[in-house]
């Protein structure tokens, strides 16, 4: 993280109901690449004297021409409040939760279609009806 990076916050609001502080973050980084989210979380944690693991930064967009990035930041009172209120995918991004393991799409479809097939006594009756119609 370079010292030439300036972080400003605006539209600061304390949200007691969700146990957090929320704000819009402006990052000035002229002539430099974008700041990483982890560096931003650490810097915001230092600015607001909180643990960096309770800080969430998202929605960062770099303005045309570079040098200026704007996004949102949420600073929770503690990590437990963060786990309670943050969406699961954001918790996965910062390492507070494990990603959901999904079954492959094709396997889900095959299972659905196998379940639709007639089996057992019903299968025998269906076979007899088809023979009677022939």
Curated annotation (Swiss-Prot):
Gene Ontology CC: cytosol; cytosolic small ribosomal subunit
Organism: Schizosaccharomyces pombe (strain 972 / ATCC 24843)
Region (Disordered): 100-134
Function description: Component of the ribosome, a large ribonucleoprotein complex responsible for the synthesis of proteins in the cell. The small ribosomal subunit (SSU) binds messenger RNAs (mRNAs) and translates the encoded message by selecting cognate aminoacyl-transfer RNA (tRNA) molecules. The large subunit (LSU) contains the ribosomal catalytic site termed the peptidyl transferase center (PTC), which catalyzes the formation of peptide bonds, thereby polymerizing the amino acids delivered by tRNAs into a polypeptide chain.
Quaternary structure note: Component of the small ribosomal subunit (SSU). Mature yeast ribosomes consist of a small (40S) and a large (60S) subunit. The 40S small subunit contains 1 molecule of ribosomal RNA (18S rRNA) and at least 33 different proteins. The large 60S subunit contains 3 rRNA molecules (25S, 5.8S and 5S rRNA) and at least 46 different proteins.
Primary site of residence: cytoplasm
Basic residues bias spans: 105-117, 124-134
Alphabetical GO biological process terms: cytoplasmic translational elongation; rRNA processing
Origin superkingdom: Eukaryota
Database matches in SUPFAM superfamilies: Ribosomal proteins S24e, L23 and L15e
Other comments on record: There are 2 genes for eS24 in S.pombe.
Signal sequence, start to end: none
Keyword Lyase: no
GO molecular function, one term: structural constituent of ribosome
UniProt record similarity statement: Belongs to the eukaryotic ribosomal protein eS24 family.
Modified residues (N-acetylserine): 2
Name this polypeptide is given: Small ribosomal subunit protein eS24A
Subcellular location: Cytoplasm
Alphabetical keyword list: Acetylation, Cytoplasm, Ribonucleoprotein, Ribosomal protein
One Pfam family linked to the record: Ribosomal_S24e
